[in-house]
Amino acid sequence: MSENPVRAFVGRSGDYRWDGVELLRYKDEGSVPFRDVTRQTLFRRPDMRGELRYFEVAPAGYSTLERHEHVHAVMILRGAGQVLVGEHVFPVTTLDLVTIPPLTWHQFRAGATSPLGFLCMVDAERDKSQLPSAHELEAMRANPTVARFFSPKGD
């Protein structure tokens, strides 16, 4: 075996990092709306279909509001926040498991004072995310709970 099979967790100083894993921007700036998110691909192999990634949303940050045909599972590893899944908003905290069904609008938001870190398991080959149209976003905002989620404390 030429490669070390262990990627040691090296985030002892408060940063959640793994040895030999590159810290990347969540997505290209300006490509889609999000705030203060990073990602790390922890596991990907050509002989397996799955991919395990770690995302971290900084305090008061959020992931992209999106949907896609593929299902994915998310386990919260750090912090607390909220997740929108469809028309429902749920509080999430460490070790909660969130299942995102196919073609379901979803977004993760960190709390105001601490980051929200989570593992995300998806197919390595997957469809591209879809963003809501202005009409779809307006329809979502008609739900008062969702509208509050999108605009916490007047954000």
Descriptions of predicted regions:
Residues H70-H72, I76-G81, G86:
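Glycine- and acidic-residue-biased ligand/ion/polar-headgroup-sensing regions
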Residues M1-R49, A134-D155:
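A short, N-terminal "cap"/entry segment at the start of jelly-roll beta-barrel domains
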Residues D47-G50, V57-Y62, A80-Q82, A124:
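Short, charged/polar surface micro-motifs in flexible loops or helix N-caps
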Residues R39-Q40, Y54, V89, W105:
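Short hydrophobic/aromatic beta-strand element in the GNAT-like acyltransferase core
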Residues D36-V37, L52-H68:
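Conserved short histidine dyad/triad with adjacent acidic residue
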Residues A73, E87-L103:
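Short acidic-glycine-tyrosine-enriched beta hairpin
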Residues G61, E69-H70, H88, T104-W105, ...:
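A generic "binding-loop/recognition-motif" signal
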Residues P46, Q82, T93-T94, P102-S129:
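Ligand-binding loop in jelly-roll beta-barrel domains
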